[in-house]
């Protein structure tokens, strides 16, 4: 071990004695595991739920073609042991969010190192490390950009201390009625996949939206004008999946319904097209007449990289038909009630989305996109670069050595930029910021105000949309602070399922009510103040009032804010950078930029920001017996106003 021999004796001993948790065995994880064992770390635990795909092989060098389909964590362990047989590595093919990996599990480790590609897992590991009191080194890459930061309870900002831009969403009426950008058509195609072959979601409907306020039309009159309600395409208001099943997933009938009849139906909404170019319906028969059939492009005849070619409309129609037939067969093989899950690396699923999206783009007069472009946009993919992962994994180890040497004050958030800044720096270190006193996770008393309509929000929505999605809880328990200890939501299976579809107002929740939400796995408690409003914006179910403010207007010099996602769909790490022209990255600390609020100034994506309740102020986690919701009384109704 050449590296450990060059370390001071005390640090070398700490390295040998330490036990590290590596979360993620992908692009960064492979490089990190290699660096750790070559540095002298021998006691490692690595966890990853993912399996190896062919697309991983160009940069995740611990894997080979023969490993495709196997656990990343297990194969990474086997590969590392080939060049470091003395290492003691434990591999877990599992999700880090599994309740088995509780606070006691995390307390086994000297520190944790994240090599993740999704925000939900990052939030969870952040909270578990705070609860266990161990340092966490966070990291992320996006193309040429990268970042490494250190998180230590009570000393630095936690991962959720600063706001992150939420993933961009689009109004349902835009997706369904008036797409104006290719991404709108791609989102529609992904929704269509789920509506036909996957789990149906009412929020992912693809049929024309007759409730579009911009249309302001008379549906009855329009339906009379539309000569497409019950002919061929059967534009009856049944679910898309029911209709598709009734046709036996006939590709031609699906094509004519989606790209002819539904478009004709849209054209009857006159007002939508007064200032827009109206869509042009497609007809299967006209696309496949003799003249067009001769123009259909055979993939095998395409020169160059076929995934980067844009086909013609007839070819995309043919691709749509072939992919529907393949997916139909996959459903049949799985049996009744089976569902498919869309995966960007599944060829038939990707072909389906590519074809459907491009046909819709053509209908709405947009330039069509290659399969490569559609895949990048559909998966929110920023192509990963092996060199970036290598640089970032090296920086993770350097920060880890600082922690083990007892020099946490020397730790830095380091940004890797695509281009050198005027000072010719590619690596830019910034001082670590102290905890944000307003953070929803690591503040002394986590508390938040949520604005919503108590007469419309259900218990299920409170659990799924607010607590799990917004506040990233895994298994929340919710108690109403009404003096009775009413249990609204229980993490025990089936205990409060009867409440799910009831409005929260039915439980006496009104303006100024307080809810205590506990996640026992994360050792996290959040007090939620309810602010009732009858005037929520359209398509907005709730708002977090006074979301964590960003720290000042500071802006990373020379480089605009970007999101670091490690090539994933929900990103997570800040990116801004400056450059460094020295080979020895250890000297980055000597050339610090002015305080940058490492996480505030960069686009750490999505997720919610929360606070952590310390042990000394933690509310007892003993679950209370569920109490039935109070009987509604007149004064309750008056109080709601």
Swiss-Prot record:
**CDD domains associated with the record:** Uba2_SUMO (cd01489)
Q: Which residues bind Zn(2+)?
A: 158, 161, 439, 442
Q: Which residues form the active site?
A: 173
Q: What Pfam families does this protein map onto?
A: ThiF, UAE_UbL, UBA2_C
Keyword check for 4Fe-4S, yes or no.
no
The protein's matches in InterPro entries, at most eight in alphabetical order, are given as: ThiF/MoeB/HesA, ThiF_NAD_FAD-bd, UAE_UbL_dom, Ub-E1_IAD_1, Ub_act_enz_dom_a_sf, Uba2, UBA2_C, Ubiquitin-activating_enz
**EC numbers:** 2.3.2.-
Catalytic class of the enzyme: transferase
Keyword match Transferase: yes
Regions that span the bilayer: none
Q: Name one GO biological process term.
A: protein sumoylation
Q: Where is the composition biased (Polar residues)?
A: 562-579
Cite the binding residues for ATP: 24-29, 48, 56-59, 72, 95-96, 117-122
**A GO molecular function for this record?**
ATP binding
The record, for PROSITE patterns, names: UBIQUITIN_ACTIVAT_2 (PS00865)
Q: Name one GO cellular component term.
A: cytoplasm
The metabolic or biological pathway listed in the UniProt record of this protein is: Protein modification; protein sumoylation
The source's superkingdom equals Eukaryota
- The region called Disordered is annotated at 546-641
Q: Where is the composition biased (Basic and acidic residues)?
A: 548-561
* Compartment(s): Nucleus
Q: What does the subunit comment say?
A: Heterodimer of sae1 and uba2/sae2. The heterodimer corresponds to the two domains that are encoded on a single polypeptide chain in ubiquitin-activating enzyme E1. Interacts with ube2i.
What name goes with this protein? SUMO-activating enzyme subunit 2-A
Please tell me the species this chain comes from.
Xenopus laevis
Task: Give the lineage.
Answer: Eukaryota, Metazoa, Chordata, Craniata, Vertebrata
């Amino acid at each position: 071990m050449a590296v450990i021999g060059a370390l001071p004796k005390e640090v070398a001993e700490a390295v040998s004695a330490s036990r590290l948790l590596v979360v993620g065995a992908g692009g960064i994880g492979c490089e990190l595991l290699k660096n750790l064992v070559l540095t002298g770390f021998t006691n490692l635990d690595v966890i990853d739920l993912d399996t190896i795909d062919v697309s991983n092989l160009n940069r995740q060098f611990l894997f080979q073609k023969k490993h495709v389909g196997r656990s990343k964590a297990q194969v990474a362990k086997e590969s590392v042991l080939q060049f470091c047989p003395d290492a003691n590595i434990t591999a877990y093919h599992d999700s880090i969010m599994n309740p088995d990996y509780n606070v006691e599990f995390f307390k086994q480790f000297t520190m944790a190192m994240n090599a993740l590609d999704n925000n939900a897992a990052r939030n969870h590991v952040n909270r578990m490390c705070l609860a266990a009191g161990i340092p966490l080194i966070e990291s992320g890459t996006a193309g040429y950009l990268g970042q490494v930061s250190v998180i230590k309870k009570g000393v630095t900002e936690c991962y959720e201390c600063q706001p992150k831009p939420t993933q961009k969403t689009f109004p349902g009426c835009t997706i369904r009625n008036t797409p104006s950008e290719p991404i709108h058509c791609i989102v529609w195609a992904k929704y269509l996949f789920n509506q036909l072959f996957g789990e149906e979601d009412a929020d992912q409907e693809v049929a024309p939206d007759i409730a579009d306020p911009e249309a302001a039309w008379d549906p009855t009159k329009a339906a009379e004008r539309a000569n497409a309600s019950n002919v061929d395409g059967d534009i009856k208001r049944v679910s898309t999946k029911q209709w598709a099943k009734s046709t036996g997933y006939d590709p031609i009938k699906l094509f004519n319904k989606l790209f002819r009849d539904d478009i004709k139906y849209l054209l009857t909404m006159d007002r939508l097209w007064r200032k827009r170019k109206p869509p042009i319906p497609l007809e299967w028969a006209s696309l496949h007449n003799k003249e067009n059939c001769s123009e259909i492009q055979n993939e095998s005849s395409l020169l160059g990289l076929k995934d980067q070619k844009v086909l013609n409309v007839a070819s995309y129609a043919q691709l749509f038909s072939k992919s529907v037939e393949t997916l139909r067969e996959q459903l049949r093989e799985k049996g009744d009630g089976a569902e498919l899950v869309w995966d960007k690396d599944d060829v038939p699923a990707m072909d389906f989305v590519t074809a459907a999206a491009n046909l819709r783009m053509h209908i709405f007069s947009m330039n069509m996109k290659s399969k490569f472009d559609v895949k990048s946009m559909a998966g929110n993919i920023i192509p990963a670069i092996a060199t970036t992962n290598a640089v970032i994994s090296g920086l993770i180890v350097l920060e880890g050595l600082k922690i083990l040497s007892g020099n946490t004050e020397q730790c830095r958030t380091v940004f890797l930029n695509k281009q050198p800044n005027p000072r010719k720096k590619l690596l830019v270190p910034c001082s670590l910021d102290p905890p944000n006193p307003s953070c929803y996770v690591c503040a002394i008393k986590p508390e938040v105000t949520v604005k919503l309509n108590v007469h419309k929000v259900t218990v299920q929505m409170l659990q799924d949309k607010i607590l799990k999605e917004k506040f990233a809880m895994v298994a929340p328990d919710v108690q109403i602070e009404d003096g009775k200890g009413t249990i609204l939501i229980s993490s025990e299976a089936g205990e409060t399922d009867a409440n799910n579809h009831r409005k929260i107002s039915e439980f006496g929740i009104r303006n100024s009510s307080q809810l205590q939400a506990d996640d026992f796995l994360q050792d996290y408690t959040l007090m939620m103040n309810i602010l009732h409003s009858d005037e929520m914006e359209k398509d907005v179910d709730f708002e977090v009032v006074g979301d964590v403010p960003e720290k000042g207007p500071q802006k990373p010099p020379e480089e605009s804010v970007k999101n670091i996602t490690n090539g994933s769909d929900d990103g997570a790490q800040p990116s801004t950078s400056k450059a460094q022209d020295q080979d020895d990255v250890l000297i980055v600390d000597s050339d610090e930029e002015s305080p940058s609020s490492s996480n505030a100034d960069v686009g750490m994506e999505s997720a919610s920001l929360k606070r952590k309740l310390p042990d000394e102020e933690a509310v007892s986690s003993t679950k209370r017996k569920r109490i039935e919701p109070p009987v509604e009384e007149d004064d309750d109704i008056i109080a709601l106003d």
